[in-house]
Amino acid sequence: MAAAAGGADDESRSGRSSSDGECAVAPEPLTGPEGLFSFADFGSALGGGAGLPGRASGGAQSPLRYLHVLWQQDAEPRDELRCKIPAGRLRRAARPHRRLGPTGKEVHALKRLRDSANANDVETVQQLLEEGTDPCAADDKGRTALHFASCNGNDQIVQLLLDHGADPNQRDGLGNTPLHLAACTNHAPVITTLLRGGARVDALDRAGRTPLHLAKSKLNILQEGHSQCLEAVRLEVKQIIQMLREYLERLGRHEQRERLDDLCTRLQKTSTREQVDEVTDLLASFTSLSLQMQNMEKR
């Protein structure tokens, strides 16, 4: 009974109940004039015999005493303030971290960002990004908002996502980067934006193809097919030229880039399918050479 009464007195003096799941600690010796928790004061209290319920006070093996020693080791007078933490913050840090994943609201925002990028909704994309929605979050197929925007050719959304930290080299479930998808469409500005944002032209998909390989495949299709109209073919060739120009610019191959500029000028002057085919053949040879140089560099 006396022990129980003593325990009750301890609880009343500490102002806290053991039912809170926290140790009762006398506030006066443990807080400074500013109400800050001090490990130094806590260690002194332990050394002075102020024990914790259910623990041996002042024991040499006390985890709290060991923590106190580590905290004070090699401390200099100017570091005194570093040894003080607000008591409330210390209690919060001691609690288990309960956030195991995004909340339902956050999941909805992530999905909405991808859907908005896919729907070319620039205003909603910007709003969600400014609210802190993660631009790198992917769906169950590994596709991010940047994958959707690159595939759709929306250069404005692509730039917005890159400005807010989207990874231009993030792969989807098939290993495609946004540049792989952009290389399969007719949107040269997106390719330029991705390359300037750090996209790698030598990134491999799961089939071992780079965006340059996809460009070469498109050129082969253009050389074999005759069903597309002249303007569509010209647009395809222009896109591939633009991608190669940015690639060579990043590598510092200015002489080769000038050759591409000449091809682009010739393309603009074409008026017949035969002239476009001639430029396409030259570009195919140039692309093959670029791929060979790329493979040599990897070795």
UniProtKB/Swiss-Prot annotation:
Function, as annotated: Plays an important role in regulating intracellular signaling events associated with erythroid terminal differentiation.
Chain positions of ANK repeats: 108-137, 141-170, 174-203, 207-239
Residues covered by region (Disordered): 1-32
GO terms for cellular component: cytoplasm; midbody; nucleus
Pfam families: Ank, Ank_2
Places the protein is found: Nucleus; Cytoplasm; Midbody
Name the UniProt record assigns to this protein: Ankyrin repeat domain-containing protein 54
Positions of post-translational Phosphoserine modification: S57, S62
Segments carrying motif Nuclear localization signal (NLS): 98-116
UniProt short sequence motif Nuclear export signal (NES), positions renumbered to this chain: 282-292
Keywords (A to Z) from UniProt: Acetylation, ANK repeat, Cytoplasm, Nucleus, Phosphoprotein, Repeat
The keyword Transferase appears for this protein: no
Domain of life per record: Eukaryota
Tagged with keyword Phosphoprotein: yes
Subunit structure: Interacts (via ankyrin repeat region) with LYN (via SH3-domain) in an activation-independent status of LYN. Forms a multiprotein complex with LYN and HCLS1. Interacts with TSN2, VAV1, DBNL and LASP1.
LYN-binding, as annotated region: 140-240
GO molecular function annotation: protein kinase regulator activity; protein-containing complex binding
